[in-house]
């Protein structure tokens, strides 16, 4: 059965793989099912996973939720999912957009400590940088493509 994907859950494209390698060359992106947890709130992945671990066991898996704006950019948002006792990853954070799976890149190097972590972005063309500098993104933020 195919899971519902929206603009927020891209196919695994060359752009996605390139961004994934820039973030963590040792991990591979994969799809993770969204199964909203008990009393979990949208937009609160770190708190939701911590509460789920406390209530049912398992552990927190930090990483990056990967998204693509076709023909514009790919983006990684620092994120947390629940690693069940059987090792499977589940996104317990409810999705108001109805998406039933996310594209997730595990990252064992970073741990959420309560402070925001800047998203990682890579332009797919010569679009101006999102920061408003007027420079091409890959020059402005040093993510020049090979």
Protein language model features and the residues they cover:
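A structural boundary/capping signal
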Residues: 1-131, 135-139, 143-146
């Amino acid at each position: 059965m195919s899971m519902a994907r929206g603009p927020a859950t891209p196919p695994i494209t060359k752009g996605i793989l390139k961004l994934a390698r820039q973030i963590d060359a040792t991990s591979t992106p994969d799809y993770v099912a969204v199964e909203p947890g008990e009393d979990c709130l949208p937009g609160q992945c770190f708190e939701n996973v911590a509460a789920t671990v406390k209530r049912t066991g398992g552990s927190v898996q930090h990483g990056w939720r990967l998204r693509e704006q076709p023909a514009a950019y790919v983006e990684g948002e620092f994120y947390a999912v629940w690693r069940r006792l059987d090792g499977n990853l589940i996104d317990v954070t409810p999705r108001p957009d109805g998406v039933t799976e996310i594209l997730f890149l595990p990252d064992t190097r970073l741990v959420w400590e309560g402070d925001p972590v800047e998203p990682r972005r890579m332009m797919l063309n010569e679009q101006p940088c999102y920061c408003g500098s007027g420079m091409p993104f890959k020059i402005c933020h040093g993510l020049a493509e090979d």
